[in-house]
Regions:
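Negatively charged
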Residues: 1-115
Length: 115
């Protein structure tokens, strides 16, 4: 397990893994439990079946545009603990393959626009 503490560290590691392992890389080895901001994290990346279902996102508060323009992206995120999230505007905009069953279950939101 590799621990990251900032969004910039995480994005850099993701880009490296995608370069070496392709758009369906297994990223579950990354400990993201200290990250609070995942806004625009995957924005525009050519990803489809990356493995991030085991990520501990329980401290994340912002997922704004996280998968924006990730048209082929599909992953089961339904078990993510998103209880601290307050912003997800355009989180799945243009992520056409993501179904409601695969999306996290949001309850306490201030800014909502999943698209």
């Amino acid at each position: 397990m590799i621990s990251v503490t900032t969004k910039d560290e995480l994005r850099s590691l993701i880009q490296t893994e995608l370069y070496y392992h392709g758009a369906d890389a297994d990223l579950n080895f990354i400990d993201v439990s200290q990250i609070t901001d995942m806004s625009c994290l995957f924005k525009g990346l050519d990803i489809w079946n990356i493995k991030i279902d085991k990520w501990d996102v329980s401290n994340v508060t912002d997922m704004y545009c996280m998968f924006f323009m990730c048209e082929k992206f599909t992953a089961d995120l339904s078990k993510w603990d998103v209880s601290k999230i307050i912003g997800i505007t355009e989180m799945f905009t243009m992520a056409k393959k993501m179904t409601e069953e695969l999306k996290p279950k949001f309850n306490n939101l201030r800014y909502v626009s999943l698209n």
